[in-house]
């Protein structure tokens, strides 16, 4: 009877695995701006990273760099040339490459558009799309597989998204937009954010992530997070996913999960992993993997 018993238990395991109704969580490593940090943060449990992108006077993406001020207990000056970083990121997210990290499924580009005007934002979006096409997506031929979020701090720079989308369409690679999502990170009111997305050509719930947060040096409540979660879960909302930044205290992580977020941006991904393994959370949440589409609202 050993074989039938083992078979039964195996079948039950498959049923349980297939019926996993826990919310997938994106553990988002913050301020990953040098190539070596990709492995560093993934080793700590991150399945997503955030990278800062700065622009030159011609609206061309130049460095992966944050600068001062930045989070407490972090070094603000790590950097790479954008092309170097994108090459490293492509390798880390391309199956078969010796540097491939299958855990890494989502990348947030925090676009430092502060020195761009509303008009040059459009140009910046076009140029950044072309750079991703060339350096990350390898011209559309077996490039990196991670999902990408274009995150912009200023809703007045919505034309960056317009330019980005148009550039991929004009390059006959509109299919790559299936891998691209959008976020405005300036903590504006949600109705204004929705309007900016619509002006950019992004429909409601079209790969929309809504961030809320502040540097880890300052405490911030969860009122706007809860408002975003209500929008996400409503029948007439515009949001697919909600994430909170930047936290690493255990109590803050628990509070964010209890509020219903889909992602947490952090300097200490191992803290998020530890909380997800706690008794009160491991039955409700799990780390997202590549089979979890970040554009699909969890029900």
UniProtKB/Swiss-Prot annotation:
| Tissue specificity annotation | Expressed by the venom gland.
Record SUPFAM superfamilies: PLC-like phosphodiesterases
Residues in a coiled coil are: none
Task: Please name the catalytic residues of this protein.
Answer: 30, 66
One BP term from GO = killing of cells of another organism
Question: Which cofactors is this protein said to need?
Answer: Mg(2+)
Where does this polypeptide localize? Answer: Secreted
Query: What's the superkingdom here?
Result: Eukaryota
- Per the record, GO CC terms? extracellular region
Chief site of localization: secreted
Name the enzyme group at the top EC level: lyase
User: Which of this chain's residues are annotated to bind Mg(2+)?
Assistant: 50, 52, 110
> Which keywords accompany this UniProt record?
Cytolysis, Dermonecrotic toxin, Disulfide bond, Hemolysis, Hemorrhagic toxin, Hemostasis impairing toxin, Lipid degradation, Lipid metabolism, Lyase, Magnesium, Metal-binding, Secreted, Signal, Toxin, Zymogen
From the UniProt annotation, give the residues forming the signal peptide: 1-18
Tell me the function of this protein: Dermonecrotic toxins cleave the phosphodiester linkage between the phosphate and headgroup of certain phospholipids (sphingolipid and lysolipid substrates), forming an alcohol (often choline) and a cyclic phosphate. This toxin acts on sphingomyelin (SM) with high activity. It may also act on ceramide phosphoethanolamine (CPE), lysophosphatidylcholine (LPC) and lysophosphatidylethanolamine (LPE), but not on lysophosphatidylserine (LPS), and lysophosphatidylglycerol (LPG). It acts by transphosphatidylation, releasing exclusively cyclic phosphate products as second products.
Name of this chain's protein: Dermonecrotic toxin LiSicTox-alphaIVA1
